[in-house]
C-alpha cells in the first residue's frame, strides 16, 4: 500500500511530458534533415562532410564545455565508484549482444554493429529530463542521510551522476566504438550462395583490369632497366644480393642495439594515438582542466575575459553538435530508403534481423538482466552512493535508455551501417521510448520504496 500511496504523489502527465518533449525534439529536427535530403540539398557526400565537421570540431567543443565546466576534482573523488558500475553495465551489454548475435545468426560485422547499439545508450537528454521531473514531484527521492535535503539538491545529484556516466560513455564510444566496433576496415560479409553469381563476376572483371594494369607497369619498369643497364638479369641479381646485404646489416644492428625496442615503442605510441579520436582528445584536455582549479577558473569563471570570449565561442560551437547529428540522421533515412542495390532483397532480410537484435537487446534484455541484480544490491548494500534514491532512478533510466543518437554520426563518418542505424534510432525514439521510459520510471520508484 505504501508504494501505491507514493505513486499517488506523481502527476502522470508531468512524467509523460518530458518524455514526449524529448522525443518530439528529436523527431522535428530529424524531419528537417529528411525533407532537405528528399529535396536534394543533402546528398550522401554532403552528409559525410557534415559528419566530419561535427566529429573534428563541433563535438570536441561540446565535450570540452560540458566536462571542463561540469566536473571538478572533489566530484570525481566522491563518485569514484561510478566507473565500476559503468564497466559492469557495459560488459554485461557486450556479453548480451554476443549471445543475441549467436542466437539470431548474425555475421561478425552485424554482431559488432549490434554490440555498439546495445552498449552505447542515451545518457544525456532523455534521462536528464526524466530525473529533473521526478526530483520535483516525488518526495521519496529525498535522501535521509543528507540533512535538509531538497528537490533541487536531488535534481543536482541526479544530473551529476548522469554527467559522469555520459563522459564515460563518450570515452568508450569514441575509442572502442569508433575504432573497432564500427570500423570501416572490417572484412565484408559474404553474400548468400544464390546471389554470388552477380557479385562474383563483377569482382573478377575488376581484378582482371587491376592485374592488366599492374602487368603493364612491371613491363615498363623492366624496359627502362634494360635500356639503362643493358642486362635485366644482371641488374636483378645484383639488386637482390644488395638487398640481402642491407637486410642482414639492418637486422644485426637492431638485434645488437635498442633499435627493435624503440621501434616497437614508437609503433605502440602511433597505434595508441591513432586509436583516439578528436572528441576523446577534447575529453582528456577538459578533464585535466577540471581537476586543476586555477585552470578551471581561468576558462569558466563567469564574467572573466576568457569565459566571455574563448569559452563562449567554444560553447556556441558545441551547441551546434547535437542538431547537426539529428539533421544527418533524418537525411540518412531519406537517402537509404530511396537507395536501390542489386542485393536489396537479401540485405533487407538481414537488416530486419539486425534491427530486431538491437532493439530487443537495448530496450528489453539488458534491463531484464541487470535491473533485478541492481535492485538486490541497493537493498542489501551499505555503500552510500547506492543508497541514494535518485541514484537508483538514474541507473534504471540509464540501463533501459535507447541507443545513443551520436551513433549515427560515427556510422556516417565511417560509412558503415548508415541505413540500419537510422532505422534503429527511428524505432527506438518514435515507438519504444515513451512506454519503456514510463515503465522504467515507475519500476525505479517501486525499488526506492522497497529499499527504504
Curated annotation (Swiss-Prot):
It comes from the Eukaryota. It is found in: Membrane. One of its GO terms (cellular component) is membrane. Its main location: membrane. It is a multi-pass membrane protein. GO terms for molecular function: transmembrane transporter activity. The chain crosses the membrane at residues 18-38, 81-101, 269-289, 317-337, 354-374, 390-410, 428-448. InterPro entries: Mem_transp_PIN-like. Keywords: Membrane, Transmembrane, Transmembrane helix, Transport. PANTHER family: AUXIN EFFLUX TRANSPORTER FAMILY PROTEIN (EUROFUNG). Belongs to the auxin efflux carrier (TC 2.A.69) family. This is Uncharacterized transporter C5D6.04. It comes from Schizosaccharomyces pombe (strain 972 / ATCC 24843).
Amino acid at each position: 500500500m505504501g508504494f501505491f500511496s507514493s505513486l499517488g504523489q506523481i502527476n502522470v502527465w508531468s512524467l509523460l511530458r518530458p518524455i514526449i518533449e524529448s522525443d518530439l525534439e528529436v523527431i522535428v529536427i530529424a524531419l528537417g534533415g529528411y525533407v532537405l535530403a528528399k529535396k536534394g540539398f543533402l546528398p550522401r557526400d554532403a552528409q559525410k562532410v557534415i559528419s566530419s565537421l561535427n566529429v573534428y570540431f563541433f563535438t570536441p567543443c561540446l565535450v570540452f564545455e560540458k566536462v571542463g565546466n561540469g566536473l571538478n576534482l572533489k566530484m570525481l573523488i566522491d563518485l569514484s565508484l561510478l566507473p565500476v558500475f559503468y564497466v559492469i553495465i557495459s560488459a554485461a551489454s557486450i556479453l548480451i549482444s554476443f549471445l543475441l548475435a549467436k542466437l539470431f545468426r548474425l555475421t561478425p560485422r552485424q554482431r559488432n554493429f549490434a554490440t555498439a547499439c546495445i552498449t552505447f545508450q542515451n545518457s544525456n537528454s532523455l534521462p536528464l529530463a526524466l530525473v529533473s521531473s521526478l526530483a520535483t514531484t516525488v518526495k521519496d527521492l529525498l535522501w535521509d542521510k543528507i540533512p535538509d535535503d531538497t528537490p533541487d539538491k536531488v535534481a543536482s545529484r541526479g544530473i551529476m551522476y548522469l554527467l559522469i556516466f555520459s563522459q564515460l560513455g563518450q570515452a568508450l564510444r569514441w575509442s572502442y566504438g569508433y575504432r573497432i566496433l564500427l570500423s570501416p576496415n572490417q572484412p565484408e560479409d559474404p553474400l548468400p550462395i544464390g546471389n554470388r553469381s552477380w557479385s562474383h563476376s563483377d569482382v573478377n572483371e575488376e581484378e582482371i583490369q587491376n592485374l592488366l594494369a599492374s602487368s603493364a607497369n612491371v613491363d615498363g619498369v623492366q624496359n627502362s632497366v634494360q635500356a639503362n643497364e643493358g642486362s635485366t638479369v644482371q641488374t636483378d641479381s645484383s639488386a637482390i644480393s644488395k638487398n640481402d646485404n642491407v637486410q642482414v646489416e639492418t637486422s644485426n644492428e637492431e638485434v645488437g642495439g635498442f633499435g627493435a625496442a624503440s621501434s616497437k615503442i614508437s609503433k605502440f605510441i602511433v597505434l595508441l594515438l591513432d586509436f583516439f579520436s578528436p572528441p576523446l582528445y577534447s575529453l582528456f584536455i577538459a578533464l585535466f582542466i577540471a581537476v586543476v582549479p586555477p585552470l578551471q577558473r581561468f576558462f569558466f569563471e563567469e564574467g572573466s575575459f576568457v569565459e566571455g570570449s574563448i569559452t563562449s565561442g567554444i560553447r556556441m560551437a558545441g551547441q551546434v553538435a547535437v542538431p547537426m547529428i539529428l539533421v544527418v540522421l533524418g537525411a540518412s533515412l531519406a537517402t537509404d530508403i530511396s537507395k536501390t542495390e542489386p542485393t536489396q532483397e537479401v540485405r533487407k532480410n538481414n537488416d530486419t534481423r539486425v534491427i530486431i537484435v538491437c532493439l530487443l537487446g537495448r530496450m528489453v534484455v539488458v534491463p531484464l538482466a541487470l535491473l533485478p541484480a541492481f535492485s538486490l544490491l541497493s537493498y542489501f548494500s551499505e555503500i552510500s552512493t547506492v543508497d541514494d534514491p535518485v541514484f537508483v532512478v538514474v541507473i534504471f533510466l540509464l540501463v533501459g535508455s535507447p541507443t545513443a543518437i551520436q551513433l549515427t554520426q560515427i556510422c556516417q563518418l565511417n560509412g558503415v551501417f548508415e541505413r540500419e542505424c537510422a532505422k534503429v534510432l527511428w524505432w527506438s525514439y518514435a515507438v519504444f521510448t515513451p512506454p519503456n521510459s514510463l515503465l522504467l520510471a515507475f519500476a525505479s520508484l517501486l525499488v526506492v520504496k522497497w529499499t527504504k
